[in-house]
């Protein structure tokens, strides 16, 4: 919706043409001729590539600073790079792509840490209650993920309808504002809430080490 309706197509074409030409020269010409589709493809590809780069840095940072602190900091910074889309006008292609790349990198730091922190919660359960609840904890996480995807998809459709979106039509200013909110402010809110909640998550680096040592000695 953002690329089809909000981004200036002429500015997008001028921005991606040199990139598409270079990629075609080296045999990577799978983005197509349509500038909107090609731009959206490059936009996503840039985020994914730098997300993978971020993942590769995750363990080293977590070992040094602790999973919770790295996860919380990276999630906060990555969310900032979502929120700033609110301030971009339709011609700010460089800033859009740069923000997407930086968001991908910092969000990539959080991906392996999320699952590692879930395992830490299972360890905490065993350490605190002498009973490991791995299956329940991971199942709850999967239910949350699937529920979030379902609710998120429904919310997108509802919000677009609220702002008067009509497929295949030229969108009014109110609808364009809604689309801009959908890529910036609305998705930022739950992430910022998660960052706030993480302040109450007790398993920091010091507690991680204590739990690990205590469990090793008791097993």
Predicted regions and their residues:
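Membrane-embedded alpha-helical bundles of multi-pass transporters/translocases
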Residues: 1-219
């Amino acid at each position: 919706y953002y690329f089809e309706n909000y981004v200036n197509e002429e500015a997008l074409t001028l921005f991606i043409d040199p990139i598409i030409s270079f990629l075609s020269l080296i045999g990577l010409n799978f983005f197509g001729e349509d500038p909107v589709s090609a731009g959206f493809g490059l936009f996503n590809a840039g985020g994914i590539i730098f997300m993978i780069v971020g993942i590769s840095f995750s363990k080293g940072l977590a070992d040094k600073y602790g999973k919770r602190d790295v996860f919380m900091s990276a999630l906060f910074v990555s969310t900032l790079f979502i929120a700033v889309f609110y301030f971009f006008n339709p011609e700010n292609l460089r800033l859009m792509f740069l923000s997407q790349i930086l968001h991908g990198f910092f969000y990539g730091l959080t991906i392996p840490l999320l699952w590692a922190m879930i395992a830490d919660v299972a360890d905490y359960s065993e350490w605190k209650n002498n009973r490991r609840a791995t299956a329940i904890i991971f199942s709850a996480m999967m239910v949350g993920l699937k529920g979030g995807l379902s609710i998120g998809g429904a919310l997108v459709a509802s919000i677009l309808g609220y702002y008067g979106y009509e497929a295949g039509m030229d969108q009014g200013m109110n609808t364009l504002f809604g689309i801009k909110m959908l890529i910036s402010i609305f998705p930022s809110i739950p992430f910022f809430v998660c960052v706030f909640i993480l302040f109450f998550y007790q398993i920091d680096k010091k507690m991680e080490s204590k739990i690990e040592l205590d469990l090793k000695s008791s097993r």
